[in-house]
């Protein structure tokens, strides 16, 4: 019948994994119909599951991947290929890196094969107005066609927005929102939806913690807000939570705590964009909700795969510029 029903998932996953151990950068060219099938079938599954996922430990949580496909394979080598471990990814699968297509196709294939053990949240780059600019559109156009990029957009518009692990760990891509008073507000967001320029959905994908801010502050991205430590503490107390787990910012060690360990930032793309010496990290949450971190060290040009660390400039990160550069900062 439809492409999605004719998917040979094992063949697709097998071809995507065949390049393990190859020279990084080797492409895997699936057929256009196979990719379309992955988008349509995963979209169905996303819509059949809640927009605010309720998950159970044990699981492994990963931050931004940004088209760094060979680093994604390293994460799975380290954490165990599905279904050996349960996974939650926090968004930003595409853009910036060279292999957004392989990255998103493997993730969607695993979602379809293991729908109750493998979860993907939406990042700010799973949005047409952003990935039109930062690489994914161009990669789709060069390797396939614009129509396929639009099929991905339809899929991304149905991704879940946030997850709560064992009623204690709140997970999203960006951060908190001044509009977020109850979890029911997230549950009421209707899909498919684009990411608006402001409001709850925008903030969950775009906001950032800032140690120098009390309450809410302006965000130098030109989108959403920053929030201080006491905003985190109040949110956790109000909702009887222990931890916020988010991604969205490159951090030197792959993970970084904020607000007395009440929030953690995860970033899973080592040597981000080839410009940074950051590590990538994955957070393992065990049955008792104890969190530990597995680190992918940055490759050092002179020392091979697991070289020494240099560092980021304090606070240094490539930021995504405003969605609309003419728009005044909030």
From Swiss-Prot:
Gene3D superfamilies: 3.60.21.10. The modification N-acetylserine is found at residue 2. Transmembrane segments: none annotated. Phosphorylated. Dephosphorylated at Thr-320 in the presence of ionizing radiation. One of its GO terms (cellular component) is nucleoplasm. Its EC number is 3.1.3.16. It catalyses: O-phospho-L-seryl-[protein] + H2O = L-seryl-[protein] + phosphate; O-phospho-L-threonyl-[protein] + H2O = L-threonyl-[protein] + phosphate. The modification Phosphoserine is found at residues 2, 22, 325. Binds 1 Fe cation per subunit. Binds 2 manganese ions per subunit. SMART domains: PP2Ac. Mn(2+) 1 binds at residues 64, 66, 92. Residues 306-330 are annotated as: Disordered. PROSITE patterns: SER_THR_PHOSPHATASE. The keyword Cell wall biogenesis/degradation does not apply. The modification Phosphotyrosine is found at residue 306. Pfam families: Metallophos, STPPase_N. Keywords: Acetylation, Carbohydrate metabolism, Cell cycle, Cell division, Cytoplasm, Glycogen metabolism, Host-virus interaction, Hydrolase, Manganese, Metal-binding, Nucleus, Phosphoprotein, Protein phosphatase. It is found in: Cytoplasm; Nucleus; Nucleus, Nucleoplasm; Nucleus, Nucleolus. Its cofactor is Fe cation; Mn(2+). It comes from the Eukaryota. The modification Phosphothreonine is found at residue 320. The modification N6-acetyllysine is found at residue 305. Induction: Up-regulated in synovial fluid mononuclear cells and peripheral blood mononuclear cells from patients with rheumatoid arthritis. PP1 comprises a catalytic subunit, PPP1CA, PPP1CB or PPP1CC, which is folded into its native form by inhibitor 2 and glycogen synthetase kinase 3, and then complexed to one or several targeting or regulatory subunits. PPP1R12A, PPP1R12B and PPP1R12C mediate binding to myosin. PPP1R3A (in skeletal muscle), PPP1R3B (in liver), PPP1R3C, PPP1R3D and PPP1R3F (in brain) mediate binding to glycogen. Interacts with PPP1R39. Interacts with BTBD10. Interacts with KCTD20. Interacts with PPP1R9A and PPP1R9B. Part of a complex containing PPP1R15B, PP1 and NCK1/2. (Microbial infection) Interacts with HHV-1 ICP34.5. Belongs to the PPP phosphatase family. PP-1 subfamily. This is Serine/threonine-protein phosphatase PP1-alpha catalytic subunit. It comes from Homo sapiens. The lineage of its organism: Eukaryota, Metazoa, Chordata, Craniata, Vertebrata.
